[in-house]
Amino acid sequence: MNRTALDQYEELVTDALKSCSAKLRKSFKTAFIQLMILYMVLPRKINFTQMGRYSDSSEQRFRQLFEREFDWIQFNLFLMRQRFGESVRKAIAIDASYISKSGKKTPYIGKFWSGCASQVKRGLEILGIGIIDIDSRDCMMLRAEQTPDKAYLEKQGEDYNLVDWYLDV
């Protein structure tokens, strides 16, 4: 039996969804699998309009899918175990990345450090948390979290700063 790469990918995503502890509806699983395949095959930027255009589902279905709670860490841990096996030598990687963004209504837009530009720039920052398999010298992302702006941190308390937020994540 000759299986394509997309068939193998669909099977892997299905197995990962089965490993999630929460009971998921069949409609959610179907839409989620379709979403993961779209991420692999969309030729341009990925947004809800493009997803609706390149699939047999509507744009609204994908919007609703993103409004639902989902345990990404458990899903990604399953994929990590599939990829790395049960090797013992692992480490946690944390990386904050600057994303250029303009606009006045974007949540948490602020001034963040850009390592490429070696300066503070206005935009967004995303904190990536991954697991490194030391033996295979490979890393897999577990979670990404948008870094809050200065105003949010000030609301949390006088002594609360960005390092405290990183530790809370």
Language model features with spans:
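Conserved, well-structured functional cores that handle cations and Mg-NTP chemistry
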Residues: M1-V169
